[in-house]
Amino acid sequence: MANSANTNTVPKLYRSVIEDVINDVRDIFLDDGVDEQVLMELKTLWENKLMQSRAVDGFHSEEQQLLLQVQQQHQPQQQQHHHHHHHQQAQPQQTVPQQAQTQQVLIPASQQATAPQVIVPDSKLIQHMNASNMSAAATAATLALPAGVTPVQQILTNSGQLLQVVRVANGAQYIFQPQQSVVLQQQVIPQMQPGGVQAPVIQQVLAPLPGGISPQTGVIIQPQQILFTGNKTQVIPTTVAAPTPAQAQITATGHQQPQAQPAQTQAPLVLQVDGTGDTSSEEDEDEEEDYDDDEEEDKEKDGAEDGQVEEEPLNSEDDVSDEEGQELFDTENVVVCQYDKIHRSKNKWKFHLKDGIMNLNGRDYIFSKAIGDAEW
């Protein structure tokens, strides 16, 4: 009893740790703009790694029991497949109704190697998905509700056989089949017309391999696109290889979707820039002449005001500017001294100088008193 209790507790502990981590980082993923499908893939990858390592026994006990049942039913199913093979080829293909209530979904397999496919009902798993309020990515992530089970998941059995587990879109069954080269296709057609069905149709099937169909009773769904026009359903089968005449396009009677109306083109509005009745150039010339006259009058007024305000000060001509001083020092016969008195009679000048220095003919002379005459 202790061993069984221990084996039941360890998988629950690992499962609770995974659930807690995924729930804690969900808000961080959403804040960073990462889709929730990435989070579900991370959870699935984590569980697959733990299951493949075989570190925890009984981590996927329900799946392992189902796999054992699949292995036991391989031989009887093969005989039953050969018995009903021709009967299935004679039945016409059926399309999915508007309210999908199918209980069995079969995946087409190769005709040469008729690998058995066993459908195992799953009554314990509950599908909690609101298809009307979820995006395509969120819907695809919600389809992988069972822990460790994705739309296409590889599971290694105790006998070393590699199987694939497929979760059906209606959440009622598992489909187990041996490892084959298949391609997962998921098509979500959100084109809803008024009066049609209210829930979007979600189709999740496997692309057919070259060959026939799987000899198993039930509804056979080929990879196709389902478009709703009014209350009718239009089914367009799609195949991987080149279509044959037998695979012609099947269309149901109904109203066709209205084509997009071309945008109404408005007549271009052309503004007249120049013409026979245009007199804008003459008006512009008149305005420019008036503007020039106004500028001249303003300049004259400003000049008169400046003349009244900025009058030259008295004795301005007697002031010696810097330029004149520079020219004085550049000349020859320079005298620098003090003076006692200066006499002037018309153009004759008489100087009484003292304590100075003079430069005459390139020579300097120092004096204490000097008298000189000049005319200019």
Curated annotation (Swiss-Prot):
Any GO CC annotation of this UniProt entry: transcription factor TFIIA complex
Post-translational modification comment from the UniProt entry: The alpha and beta subunits are postranslationally produced from the precursor formby TASP1. The cleavage promotes proteasomal degradation.
UniProt biased composition (Acidic residues): 280-329
Amino acid composition bias (Low complexity), ranges on this chain: 69-79, 89-105
One GO-annotated biological process of the protein: transcription initiation at RNA polymerase II promoter
Keyword Acetylation listed: yes
Residues annotated with N-acetylalanine modification: A2
Site feature location: Cleavage: D274, G275
Gene3D superfamilies, per the entry: 1.10.287.100, Transcription factor IIA (TFIIA), beta-barrel domain
InterPro entries, per database record: TFIIA_asu/bsu, TFIIA_b-brl
Residue span of region Disordered: 69-107, 246-265, 274-329
Residues annotated to bind DNA: H343, R344
Compartment(s): Nucleus
Pfam families for the chain: TFIIA
Keywords: Acetylation, Nucleus, Phosphoprotein, Transcription, Transcription regulation
Modification Phosphoserine, positions: S280, S281, S316, S321
Function: TFIIA is a component of the transcription machinery of RNA polymerase II and plays an important role in transcriptional activation. TFIIA in a complex with TBP mediates transcriptional activity.
Family per similarity comment: Belongs to the TFIIA subunit 1 family.
Subunit structure: TFIIA is a heterodimer of the large unprocessed subunit 1 and a small subunit gamma. It was originally believed to be a heterotrimer of an alpha (p35), a beta (p19) and a gamma subunit (p12). TFIIA forms a complex with TBP.
Name of the molecule in the record: Transcription initiation factor IIA subunit 1
Organism of origin: Pongo abelii
Gene name as annotated: GTF2A1
